[in-house]
Amino acid sequence: MRSTRLISIYPGILITGFSILDFQKSKIKLIAYGVIKPKKKDRIEKRLLHLHDEILSIIKKFDPSVMAIEDSFYGKNVKSTVILGQARSVMMLAGAKLNLDIFQFAPRKIKQSLCGNGSASKEQVQFMVSSILKLESLPTPIDITDAMAVGICFVNNYNTI
């Protein structure tokens, strides 16, 4: 049986974390990870283009068949929520262009899947990611382990999707 490769994304307009994971049933192997950081001084449309182009490049390099991305949370700042939605959209568009199956997970679902508690802290999520992927040290910034958590959530829910 062949393993499935996925790109998992923790979206942000300033820092986007990503990871590439291979999995077969419940066995997960970390292939690569990193961050995409558009320039803060750039206008929003340039940052969105940068996110799109970088995700497209990563997908072409690693050839995943699935994208798992964290869904937007609904905060008090409407403008921030809209901008995050735009960032998510351009990354999902990159995946759609290359025919990836795209799955979205709410933050609470990700925490529930990894920690058994939808209100788990960032530290609890990091601990579980580190344990599951057998990381020697936690990558920084935290956006990377958040992206890994999205991918693990997909794997944990793969047979029910």
Language-model region placement:
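Phosphate- and other anionic-substrate recognition elements at nucleic-acid/protein interfaces
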Residues: 1-161
